[in-house]
Amino acid sequence: MPTSNPAKPLDGFRVLDFTQNVAGPLAGQVLVDLGAEVIKVEAPGGEAARQITSVLPGRPPLATYFLPNNRGKKSVTVDLTTEQAKQQMLRLADTADVVLEAFRPGTMEKLGLGPDDLRSRNPNLIYARLTAYGGNGPHGSRPGIDLVVAAEAGMTTGMPTPEGKPQIIPFQLVDNASGHVLAQAVLAALLHRERNGVADVVQVAMYDVAVGLQANQLMMHLNRAASDQPKPEPAPKAKRRKGVGFATQPSDAFRTADGYIVISAYVPKHWQKLCYLIGRPDLVEDQRFAEQRSRSINYAELTAELELALASKTATEWVQLLQANGLMACLAHTWKQVVDTPLFAENDLTLEVGRGADTITVIRTPARYASFRAVVTDPPPTAGEHNAVFLARP
């Protein structure tokens, strides 16, 4: 007869979780469900996802980004910029098996909580990092969220709207996939530590996960002549669509002078900065757009105002300006364009498989480990190639 509290695979393991929003917390949630003790580290007042809510008839607003991915965790609130908080986190990390973090590259090092800082005190610590773009070079240190990463990785142009507008995926596909990949990588690192005594530094980039999800489609463009440089599609006469339920506007594809740009600026400070950069500071005080929820309710009017301002520059000009000022914006690339971008090359996302004339280029799996290169370049086997090895009678 089963016991009321059966053993779980991660019983006795402690995880220190510095992540927020969706992808990182989902990885922590997987570990909680497998038995780990996960201590969530939040800023005073709690992480931002606690405030992103949806309204359902007859009940208070639900924090639909926060609630599904933080079940059973423990929470501490600290200001990581203070020396007291740093010392508290160092002591906690001394007792942990895993650290999860998802800040922009270099942030934890500036706080004195990077992998070298923590692992010099706790050599058995596995340090798992989630980033938007990998932090591998000049194109990889930008901030990014699901919508923008998906667009830049080619996910929004394969099935455009009837008007030609990039199709925004209506749920957090890249976030959720990245969370599961990060959890898988942590489990592999724990097994590596238990079997081989190696405590690894694990890295997962959401962009790499998004590319990996489209490996079949991108392979077609990796194994033929080079494509043209990325360029926005011509702007069609677009119809308006209804507002969305989540209070995360503006987060969509918007028309510019020559095509579409994908922008996510729903955080209050980002919204204010966007308004000033596009020359519309008056929108900050406009009551229709004063809060996240009102911007969502008045989505059609919001889109009209933004596109009126964005019509003054090309999509590429806006991307350069907004990114230079720390906002999340990108072109919605096609698959053909993705494989020719500097970011794609910077993240070392391809493998040469096979030999000679049979060599093909494929997409590698996204998780990276400091202690070994997680790739195999042998070609797939022919059907039944190993029958004699495994099916022969002893």
Swiss-Prot record:
Q: What class of enzyme is it?
A: transferase
Q: Which residues form the active site?
A: D175 (nucleophile)
Q: Which InterPro entries match?
A: CoA-transferase_III_domain, CoA-Trfase_fam_III, CoA-Trfase_III_dom3_sf, CoA-Trfase_III_dom_1_sf
Taking the record's annotation, the residue ranges forming a coiled coil are none
Q: What is its EC number?
A: 2.8.3.-
Please provide the record's keywords in A-Z order: Transferase
Name the SUPFAM superfamilies on file: CoA-transferase family III (CaiB/BaiF)
The UniProt similarity line reads:
Belongs to the CoA-transferase III family.
**Assembly with partners or alone:** Homodimer.
Report what the protein is called: Probable fatty acyl-CoA transferase Rv3272
Q: Which organism is it from?
A: Mycobacterium tuberculosis (strain ATCC 25618 / H37Rv)
User: Taxonomic lineage per UniProt?
Assistant: Bacteria, Bacillati, Actinomycetota, Actinomycetes, Mycobacteriales
